[in-house]
């Protein structure tokens, strides 16, 4: 059975409500993994999830640990979450570069997928921060500077360009509309199998 390591798609929300003179705050946690988990498990894939706030303690820090998985997926998790653990950020202690570890994993035959979102590719206000990282090296696209999001509240439907490409096996030719995407440029030699927007 294939094993997939899915990283991200989780968040904590802090809310402050003001009601006249009075205010109060509350927090809650959410994650959005149910659809992709169900799809992968239906295809016979063993699904392992690391929420964003647990990357520091759970993401593999060795090539051997990462090699236990057939594929690594990043979804809405920023480069800072991957590469600024507390030992680096607060204590100035060098540690493993997780993004370089993923690049080496791919160079040795591992599969990597980045799913678009507010904190992947460059994301909202450029906060995804993957430009000029080891991850950009292994992606088949070039990342833009700054905020790469295109919000389309009217919905846009991706157009399949190469339906016979192996990655498209089992996928319908007509896709549902999306409400936003990350604008990216294909690298020379990359196969473009679908396109959206300009």
Region annotations inferred by a language model:
Residues 3-7, 11, 64-125:
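Short alpha-beta junction capping motif
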Residues 32, 36-39, 49, 65, ...:
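Stable alpha-helical elements in mature extracytoplasmic
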Residues 7, 50-53, 195:
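Conserved beta-strand termini and adjacent loop/short-helix elements that scaffold enzyme active sites
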Residues 4-6, 23, 39:
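Intrinsically disordered, low-complexity, charge-biased terminal/linker regions in eukaryotic proteins
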Residues 41-64:
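A short, well-structured beta->alpha microelement
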Residues 12-18, 111-197:
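An acidic, glycine-rich "communication" segment
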């Amino acid at each position: 059975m294939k094993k997939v390591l899915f990283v991200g798609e989780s968040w904590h929300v802090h809310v402050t409500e003001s009601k006249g003179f009075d205010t109060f705050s509350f927090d809650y946690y959410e994650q959005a993994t149910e659809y992709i988990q169900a799809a992968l498990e239906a295809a016979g894939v063993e699904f392992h999830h690391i929420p964003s706030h647990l990357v520091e303690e759970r993401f593999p820090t060795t090539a051997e640990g990462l090699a236990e998985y057939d594929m690594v997926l990043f979804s809405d998790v920023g480069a800072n979450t991957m590469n600024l653990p507390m030992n680096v950020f607060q204590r100035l202690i060098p540690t493993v570069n997780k993004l370089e570890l993923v690049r080496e994993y791919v160079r040795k035959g591992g599969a990597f997928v980045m799913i678009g979102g507010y904190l992947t590719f460059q994301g909202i206000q450029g906060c995804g921060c993957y430009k000029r990282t080891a991850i950009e090296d292994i992606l088949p696209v070039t990342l833009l500077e700054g905020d790469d999001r295109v919000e389309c509240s009217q919905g846009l439907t991706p157009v399949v360009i190469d339906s016979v490409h192996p990655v498209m096996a089992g996928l319908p030719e007509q896709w549902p509309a999306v409400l936003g995407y990350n604008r990216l440029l294909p690298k020379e030699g990359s196969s473009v199998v679908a396109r959206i927007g300009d």
